[in-house]
Amino acid sequence: MKDLSNENVIHIVKDGVQYLQFRRLLEYSDILVHAYSLGIDKNFRTARAKTAEPITKEEFKEANKDYADLCNAIEMNYIDLVKPNQAHTKNVKKVDEHVNINKPDFNLKEYDLTDGLITNKSNILLATT
């Protein structure tokens, strides 16, 4: 496996999960945790576009496991994930609290046709595909 690290990013492989972290963002590690998965042998798609065929239960289960593995690698709580249903729009929503209690906020109507999320809450972990 080729190391993709350079002057801007660090390529990390931890517990079988590969991800990138930006050196500049790491300067704010006291207030920000970030990771950009390489998606190598991983499936982070919890839904398909509204015009496409829905994903299978098995695909959804695999995506959830892959998100959980990534969260474990960066020492974050998988249940704190909030992920929009992207549709290549200009829509961005603010997230103030979780909708679900004991599972991530995936595929929720609240985030239909939303391509970005913002928050200032420390217990909300934002994700996209």
Residue ranges and their predicted role:
Residues 14-26, 83-92:
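N-terminal short beta-loop-beta anion/metal-coordinating cradle
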Residues 67-129:
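Phosphate-centric recognition/catalysis
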Residues 13-17, 60-64, 106-108, 116-117:
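A short linear-motif detector with a strong N-terminal bias
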Residues 7, 27-30, 53, 58-62, ...:
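Glutamate identity and glutamate-enriched acidic tracts
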Residues 1-3, 58, 84, 102-103:
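Polar low-complexity intrinsically disordered regions
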Residues 21-71:
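Intrinsically disordered, low-complexity, positively charged segments
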Residues 1-18:
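Short, Gly/Pro- and small/polar-rich lid/capping loops
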